[in-house]
Amino acid sequence: VKILPPALPALFLAAALPSLGLAAERPEGIAAAEAIAKAALGADCDMNGMEEVPMVGPEAEGFGHALYRFTYKPDYDPNGPGVEATLYQLFCGSGAYNIRNAFVLQTSDADTPKLIAFATPDLAYAYANEENSRLTAEPKINGFRATTLLVNASFNEKTRTITSHAAWRGIGDAWDSGDWVFRNGNFMLTRFEFDPTYGDPDPAVPESYVVYEAGK
């Protein structure tokens, strides 16, 4: 079986940024979060060379940092006071159609913020033709690896879920998507789905493969 990790061909292509419009003031702690991400990721988190990345909202399509605050009860002290958490979603850079994001978490029970590492399946699959439009068999999971960069990520404050959706090329026919839910101070992988096939939809080929779903 040929092992082909999901490729993100446009992640490192230079791209012009859209107009950011009015940006929020940079909050306390954002500079420290940036420093952690840059130190760990180097050129993969060059933030498109911007000296100061603005704080932006959904209207800016992710070309900036975002901040979320919430409180949770840790397992080690469920009856005690809640732990305050600040989640920094950092714009690390962009390509032609993908945005790279890193996430840094600061909690009131920890002295320093931490760069979040996300569990991701290591996939094994093989194409059945030169067009890469179908597989020889259903994909398998070799195991799991950790990544500190997600693509086109978003955070759902209600469910406390980070979701990523990476397009493997511009038209988006091949892609991968993951969900990570916040539980007891960490983000846990709960679902991973991908479509490694290219070209027009084929009724004989599955639309996508859910290769991991927690509890199943």
Which residues are covered by each model-predicted region?
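Acidic/hydrophobic-patterned starts of short beta strands in beta-sheet-rich repeat architectures
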Residues: 80-91, 100-103, 157-165
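Structural motif
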Residues: 96-104, 172-179
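Short, flexible beta-strand-to-coil junctions
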Residues: 90-97, 108-109, 165-172
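Bacterial N-terminal signal peptides
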Residues: 7-18
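Positively charged n-region of N-terminal signal peptides that target proteins for export
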Residues: 1-6
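Terminal domain-start segments
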Residues: 21-83
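Surface-exposed loop/turn elements that mediate protein-protein interactions on large endomembrane-trafficking
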Residues: 109-116
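Short aromatic loop motif centered on NTY/YTY
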Residues: 116-184, 188-216
